[in-house]
């Protein structure tokens, strides 16, 4: 099979290809109000997945996530896309049951490439303990792949992205820098060892982090993907709460700051930052690349959890025991709708 650089076939890679939050907000406001009492989570809080109660003991959790290639290797594109799709289920505190493939694929590419992508997705689903039961394919000018994932959760144990509580600590379970580094990889300027580290972060499931999150109990949680750390934090806060985050406490993939300094950002970073600026207060002097880094779109990023001070130590300890990063990056405040960024 002839080597094809998948990232060269697309204008925007991975979760950086998401529609801008501003445009999405304009579109979603036209959707009708949901009045079904069994619809426990819908579009109103921009949460990670839909949740529908089917009994007093069970609710279905359903998500769909797909994107353009974030790496050139077809197999690892499949692996990363599947991990990213599963993440929404984990972020809700649910257990995945099965998945369906969602595929857009150009006619000009050999079908063996698609078969390899699907194998990557199936292997990652197998690691998560679920089968892939089918899917849907369309001809497309740019390759796209992802999954619909169905999970289950007790209706009383859903972990939502809102509301957190003032005084909660913010815990992040993966380092940032995926968007800037994958953009550099697309341009061919990222060293092989750095690219390998990015791939390892993206292909890691959030299952262990979710297990601890459910066991300990948190106020709110979400996964960090296309809207960046600041964007998904703002969804957690909405207009009711605020947050303080500390730049020096935010973990980054080795090499990420170097490429941030070169302004190797996907377009989505600027879109995210511009949308959020009215809600941001940078306490002191911050370089543009530092601001963009916090809005950098992540593909298969970590979980962001708001946890009470009483449970924080237990959460961090148990995450670390599972080999999961547990970086305390900030705190929830009562400063409505404002994110204060400090050093």
From Swiss-Prot:
The keyword Kinase applies. It is an enzyme of class 2 (transferase). Transmembrane segments: none annotated. The keyword ATP-binding applies. Its cofactor is Mg(2+). Signal peptide: none annotated. GO terms for molecular function: ATP binding; magnesium ion binding; selenide, water dikinase activity. InterPro entries: PurM-like_C_dom (IPR010918), PurM-like_C_sf (IPR036676), PurM-like_N (IPR016188), PurM-like_N_sf (IPR036921), SelD_I (IPR023061), SPS/SelD (IPR004536). It catalyses: hydrogenselenide + ATP + H2O = selenophosphate + AMP + phosphate + 2 H(+). Mg(2+) binds at residues 48, 88, 223. The active site is at residue 15. Its EC number is 2.7.9.3. Coiled coil: none annotated. One of its GO terms (biological process) is selenocysteine biosynthetic process. Keywords: ATP-binding, Kinase, Magnesium, Metal-binding, Nucleotide-binding, Selenium, Selenocysteine, Transferase. ATP binds at residues 18, 45-47, 65, 88, 135-137. Binds 1 Mg(2+) ion per monomer. It comes from the Bacteria. Homodimer. PANTHER family: INACTIVE SELENIDE, WATER DIKINASE-LIKE PROTEIN-RELATED, SELENIDE, WATER DIKINASE. Belongs to the selenophosphate synthase 1 family. Class I subfamily. Synthesizes selenophosphate from selenide and ATP. This is Selenide, water dikinase. It comes from Carboxydothermus hydrogenoformans (strain ATCC BAA-161 / DSM 6008 / Z-2901).
């Amino acid at each position: 099979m002839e080597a094809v650089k998948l990232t060269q076939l697309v204008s925007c890679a991975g979760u950086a290809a998401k529609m801008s939050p501003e445009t999405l907000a304009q579109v979603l406001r036209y959707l009708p109000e949901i009045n079904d009492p069994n619809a426990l989570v819908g579009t109103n809080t921009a949460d990670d997945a839909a949740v529908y109660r089917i009994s007093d003991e069970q609710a279905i959790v359903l998500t769909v996530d797909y994107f353009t290639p974030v790496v050139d290797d077809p197999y690892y594109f499949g692996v990363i896309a599947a991990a990213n799709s599963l993440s929404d289920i984990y972020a809700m505190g649910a257990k995945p049951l099965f998945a369906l493939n969602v595929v857009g694929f150009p006619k000009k590419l050999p079908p063996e490439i698609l078969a390899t992508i699907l194998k990557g997705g199936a292997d990652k689903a197998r690691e998560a303990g679920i089968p892939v039961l089918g899917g849907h394919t369309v001809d497309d000018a740019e390759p796209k792949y992802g999954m619909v994932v169905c999970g289950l959760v007790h209706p009383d144990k859903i972990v939502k992205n809102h509301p957190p509580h003032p005084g909660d600590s913010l815990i992040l379970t993966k380092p940032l820098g995926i968007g800037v580094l994958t953009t550099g990889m697309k341009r061919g300027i990222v060293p092989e060892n750095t690219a390998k580290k990015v791939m390892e972060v993206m292909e890691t499931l959030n299952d262990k982090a979710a297990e601890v999150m459910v066991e300990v109990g948190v106020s709110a949680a979400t996964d960090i993907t296309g809207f960046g750390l600041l964007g998904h934090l703002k969804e957690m806060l909405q207009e009711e709460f605020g947050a303080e985050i500390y730049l020096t406490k935010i973990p980054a993939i080795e090499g990420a700051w170097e490429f941030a300094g070169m302004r190797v950002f996907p377009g989505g970073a600027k879109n995210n930052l511009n949308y959020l600026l009215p809600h941001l207060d940078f306490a002191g002097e911050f370089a543009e690349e530092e601001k963009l880094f916090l809005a950098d779109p992540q593909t298969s990023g970590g979980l962001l959890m708001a946890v009470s001070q009483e449970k924080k130590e237990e959460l961090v300890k148990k995450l670390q025991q599972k080999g999961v990063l547990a970086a305390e990056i900030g705190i929830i405040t009562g400063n409505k709708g404002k994110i204060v960024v400090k050093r």
